[in-house]
Amino acid sequence: MKISKTKTPKLVLIAGPCVIESLDNLRGIAIKLQPLANNERLDFYFKASFDKANRTSLESYRGPGLEKGLEMLQAIKDEFGYKILTDVHESYQVSIAVKVADILQIPAFLCRQTDLIVEVSQTNAIINIKKGQFMSPKDMQYSVLKALKTRDKNIQNPTYENALANGVWLCERGSSFGYGNLVVDMRSLKIMREFAPVIFDATHSVQMPGGANGKSSGESSFAPILARAAAAVGVDGLFAETHIDPKNALSDGANMLKPNELESLVTDMLKIQNLF
């Protein structure tokens, strides 16, 4: 896979539900995503979490867990031929998750966790590091460098080119804006793209953390607007959570797009890419 700094031959698309609810639910979403997965202009990855370890409330659904969750992701991989992204929260999960996942994701709250970044970087998986809501875009270069130096001890400074070559990506998902809200500073896309490929997370960027009495809320209607803006600034890919029935999703339903909405958004982003 090649990602160009100025005009992406293939837009990376990472899409799927927030959390694994059931195999039937995963299959239903995977079927709906087939038109996007088969689009020759996209480099598609199916995503889902086996455990949402940072839910606001202890009572909130977390997922099926590591073993059962990975079994279900492997089933999707086998049936549809999709490449897989899943996130890891603890170092011990890495050696198990990498048997299924093509991309291992570092959650935003853990983007400075050296041991976790190093553990993932010792695998052959692409590492997608989410920018913490509390982090400046410039400071994300140090998380990138942790991964790069683990994979190539001769690297002294992170660049887009050496991060691309070593499979180290960053993901923008918004910054804290007071209590219970996020805002996207589009300058961060340009800043971080100086030292790594950048994926824009459109759906988590419209999250309202803790805004619904023990649950996070969100405003999914703004996700396409921000994604189109990100495409105009220049990004290497789109991360978007999708669900057939967002209102009844077990996690982050308020942020998610329906598959047909996602398909329309991706069409817009590809058109915008053609302008530059």
From Swiss-Prot:
Major place of residence: cytoplasm
SUPFAM superfamilies assigned: Aldolase
Keywords: Cytoplasm, Lipopolysaccharide biosynthesis, Transferase
Record EC number: 2.5.1.55
GO biological process, any: keto-3-deoxy-D-manno-octulosonic acid biosynthetic process
Pfam families cross-referenced by the UniProt entry: DAHP_synth_1
Catalytic activity annotation: D-arabinose 5-phosphate + phosphoenolpyruvate + H2O = 3-deoxy-alpha-D-manno-2-octulosonate-8-phosphate + phosphate
Homology family: Belongs to the KdsA family.
PANTHER family, per database record: PHOSPHO-2-DEHYDRO-3-DEOXYHEPTONATE ALDOLASE
Name recorded for this polypeptide: 2-dehydro-3-deoxyphosphooctonate aldolase
UniProt source species: Helicobacter acinonychis (strain Sheeba)
Organism classification: Bacteria, Pseudomonadati, Campylobacterota, Epsilonproteobacteria, Campylobacterales
